[in-house]
From Swiss-Prot:
The gene is dcd. This is dCTP deaminase, dUMP-forming. InterPro entries: dCTP_deaminase, dUTPase-like_sf, dUTPase_trimeric. HAMAP family: dCTP_deaminase. It is an enzyme of class 3 (hydrolase). The record marks 116-117 as: Important for bifunctional activity.
Length: 189
């Protein structure tokens, strides 16, 4: 069941759902708007010949931050990682879906490529997979509304929520845009 604005406020007031910093004006009828942080991970296209998910490639991305008051410019066809300004903490009976903002989608900005699901128990900044499918550059301003977080109530609390040792949570507690840890999904020899 998708939570309404009333339910979202009740979960936040009860301290079960954490959104920090929280601004009540960001609550929509069935979601909470989230904003863009100031850190981005840019791919180093000349460092590797290809991306291999089975290999740890620490220098695949570089963390960049625009100067104070300046935007990050996302060029056509470019893909970077960003993150929400807000730290989100979900209880073990709520899951989240990050959706893009319609107004930004109409400009050609994709907020996530594939990973819009947030497991119950997750705590941290939500990493954004930002793509520009327009044919002009798009300026991304730190602090701008970038997406909306929808919350869904599970039929029962998760037995092993994200962050528990049983599920191998790679991104619990992440701060800022976090690079892929896909290599951990492969058997290590």
């Amino acid at each position: 069941m998708l939570l309404s604005d009333r339910d979202l406020r009740a979960e936040i007031s009860a301290g079960r759902l954490g959104i920090d910093p929280f601004d009540d004006s960001m609550v929509q009828p069935s979601s909470v708007d989230v904003r863009l942080d100031s850190l981005f991970r840019v791919f180093n296209n000349t460092r590797y010949t290809h991306i291999d998910p089975a290999q740890r490639q620490d220098e695949l991305t570089t963390l960049v931050e625009p100067a104070e008051g300046e935007p990050f410019v996302l060029h056509p066809g470019e893909f970077v990682l960003g993150s929400t300004l807000e730290v989100c903490s979900l209880p073990d009976d709520l899951a989240g879906r990050l959706e893009g903002k319609s107004s930004l989608g109409r400009l050609g900005l994709l907020t996530h490529s594939t990973a819009g699901f947030i497991d119950p128990g997750f705590n941290g900044h939500i990493t954004l997979e930002l793509s520009n499918v327009a044919n002009l550059p798009i300026t991304l301003w730190p602090g701008m509304k970038i997406g909306q977080l929808c919350l869904l109530r599970l039929s029962s609390a998760a037995e092993h929520p994200y962050g528990s040792s049983a599920v191998g949570s790679k991104y619990q507690g992440q701060r800022g845009p976090t690079p892929s840890k896909a290599y951990l999904n492969f058997a290590q020899s």
